[in-house]
Amino acid sequence: MTKRRGNSTDRPPRAGSSVAPAGQRVRRWAIPGLLAAAVLVAIGVLAFGGGTTASDPAGGTASVRPVLGKAEAPVLIREYGDFQCPSCGAFARLIEPQIRAAYIDTGKVRLEWHDFAWIGAESRDAANAARCAGDQGKFWEYHDLLYQSQSGENQGAFSKDRLKSFGAGLGLGTATFGACIDGGNHLAAVQADFADVSSKGFNGTPTFVIGTQRIVGAQPFEVFQAAIEAALATK
């Protein structure tokens, strides 16, 4: 089976309503042997609609679930993304700032990050590095920098040396951050997230879950706004 690299989707929704209009760019993946490996190393696979505040793989470094926003915010957005995914980058650069300003900064929404690192080794290394930055309180700053620095897939844009240089630019402790990247301290948590995503049947990045609605792709702000307002109306 090969990866489908088309830019649109017409597949039916699963597990609640799903938004993914034709013509919207979405990265899709197929299920190769990577899935079996991810399942073997993952623990605590969650059912659709479940949640967690931390991943703590056996024998690995405890990896706190990155969350942006106030803990008491009534609506939760779960984002499943890959740092090499162009559509994920488009969302992060163009749509997410609007959601932050309208809903996260105002205390109505919190955004929870889940790694869907499927495009290749640089996706997994970038996801690990972002969590390493999170160890020093700068996950979201590093998240933003990764998406601003996208340049091809598995072509060196997110080599370990470059990932370390990004951390230096953010003022992260060089020795600690570099050791975390080289040691793959959070790779088990990244793989656990991948197995969780696989168990839900998601096959496009980015994917979002807001209440009972699933949104696939870098949809216009108005699509997210409608889903958020619907979720707020139930609170």
Please describe what each predicted stretch is.
Residues 66-68, 102, 197-199:
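Short, flexible, glycine/charge-rich loop motifs used to bind or transfer phosphoryl groups or to couple energy/partner
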Residues 43-61:
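C-terminal region of N-terminal signal peptides and the immediate post-cleavage residues
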Residues 1-48, 93-96, 165-235:
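C-terminal cap of thioredoxin/glutaredoxin-like
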Residues 73, 78-168, 173, 234-235:
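Structural alpha/beta surface segment adjacent to cysteine/selenocysteine redox centers
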Residues 65, 117, 130, 151, ...:
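Conserved short-loop catalytic and cofactor-binding motifs
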Residues 67-68, 158, 215:
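Short clusters of hydrophobic/aromatic residues that line enzyme substrate/ligand-binding pockets
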Residues 58-75:
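A short beta-strand-turn-helix
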